[in-house]
Amino acid sequence: MKTLVIASLSGGQGKTTTAFFLGKLLSQSAKVLFIDADPQSNLTFFLGHEVEPSAPTLLELIKDMVEPADAVYSLANSNQFLIPSDDGLSNAQEYLASSGMGAVVLKARLKPLSEYFDYCIIDSPPARTQISIATIGAADQLLIPAEASTKGVNSLIRTLEIVQSLEKLGAFTGSILGVIPFRDKWFGLSQSKDSAGAIAAMKEVAPQLRIFPSILESERYKQALNQGILLSELGYPDLEKPFEGVKEALGIKQLVQI
């Protein structure tokens, strides 16, 4: 199982959007385990899962209260599975902080599941917390969405800083797959100056990293999320280019549409 963490240390950077559509695309040819590591639980909602009272979630998995398999739920698609979250996930902060091994706890908890799935997609929380540190520590590869704005550039910088600090401690042993610009604004065939400037700044901040095609500013993403479907199913396959680019980077050949 390859664990791909979607991380960016600010809100509104496209983490859940990226996790949802990338995981859906990968599940066309592989078994995918989604993990919602954000107490806001947006990924859980968009994937159509409702957490039942007393049902195991990521919190119970992190705290080693259940067997890993007991926190995994099957979704409508037979190749898609989910470890959900709810607002109780915030209670994991103290546990991770006091464990002395917070950065590696999630990686250890997921190890027994590795033989059952091809990919694990983790939607990380939007702040520098013990949970976000644990998700980064679990990553084989890290994908950083960043809004095509000054806020997005700052989020990229902060994310790279925490990755570097964890790498120095030996808590992050993976690699950074690249950056996906989010909410790239275009007016017809013309890109906005703010978006162009922000993406140029991203390239300056991280010249060694691959910049994937942008997630454009479009209501179509929200429509597809709300319906729980791919953009291609909505009739807008061109808007999936960022996620197809990530598939290519992962070494997965694009499926031929018949």
Swiss-Prot record:
Range of residues in the leader sequence: none
Intracellular or extracellular location(s): Cytoplasm; Cytoplasm, Nucleoid
InterPro entries in UniProt: AAA_dom, DNA_Partitioning_ATPase, P-loop_NTPase
Site feature location: McdA subfamily signature lysine residue: K151
Catalyzed reactions per annotation: ATP + H2O = ADP + phosphate + H(+)
Coiled-coil residues: none
EC number: 3.6.4.-
Variant or mutagenesis effect after changing D38A: Binds DNA in the presence of ATP and Mg(2+), probably does not hydrolyze ATP, 7-fold reduction in ATP affinity. DNA-binding is significantly reduced
Stored Pfam families: AAA_31 (PF13614)
Keyword ATP-binding set for record: yes
SUPFAM superfamilies (alphabetical): P-loop containing nucleoside triphosphate hydrolases
Binding site for ATP 1: G11, G12, Q13, G14, K15, T16, T17, Q40, F182, L216, E217, S218, Y221
Keywords: ATP-binding, Carbon dioxide fixation, Cytoplasm, DNA-binding, Hydrolase, Nucleotide-binding, Plasmid
MF-aspect GO terms: ATP binding; DNA binding; hydrolase activity
Main EC class the enzyme belongs to: hydrolase
GO cellular component: cytoplasm; nucleoid
Ranges that cross the membrane: none
Positions of Mg(2+) binding: T16
Entry function: McdA and McdB together mediate carboxysome (Cb) spacing, size, ultrastructure and probably inheritance in the cell, together they prevent Cb aggregation. McdA is an ATPase that forms dynamic gradients on the nucleoid in response to adapter protein McdB, which associates with carboxysomes. The interplay between McdA gradients on the nucleoid and McdB-bound carboxysomes result in the equal spacing of Cbs along the cell length. Incorrect positioning (aggregation) of carboxysomes results in reduced CO(2) fixation by encapsulated ribulose-1,5-bisphosphate carboxylase (RuBisCO, cbbL/cbbS), which leads to slower growth.
Domain remark text: Has an adenine-nucleotide sandwich dimer structure in common with ParA ATPases. Nucleotide-binding forces changes that create an ATP-binding pocket.
Subunit structure: Homodimerizes in the presence of ATP, making extra nucleotide contacts than with ADP or AMP-PNP. Each subunit binds 1 ATP molecule; Glu-147, Lys-151 and Arg-183 cross the dimer interface to contact ATP in the other subunit, while Phe-182, Arg-183 and Tyr-221 stack with the adenine base in their own subunit. Forms a complex with McdB.
General remark: A type 1 McdA protein.
Family membership noted in the UniProt record: Belongs to the ParA family. McdA subfamily.
PANTHER family membership: COBYRINIC ACID AC-DIAMIDE SYNTHASE, P-LOOP CONTAINING NUCLEOSIDE TRIPHOSPHATE HYDROLASE
Protein name (database record): Maintenance of carboxysome distribution protein A
Species the sequence originates in: Gloeothece citriformis (strain PCC 7424)
Gene from which this protein is expressed: mcdA
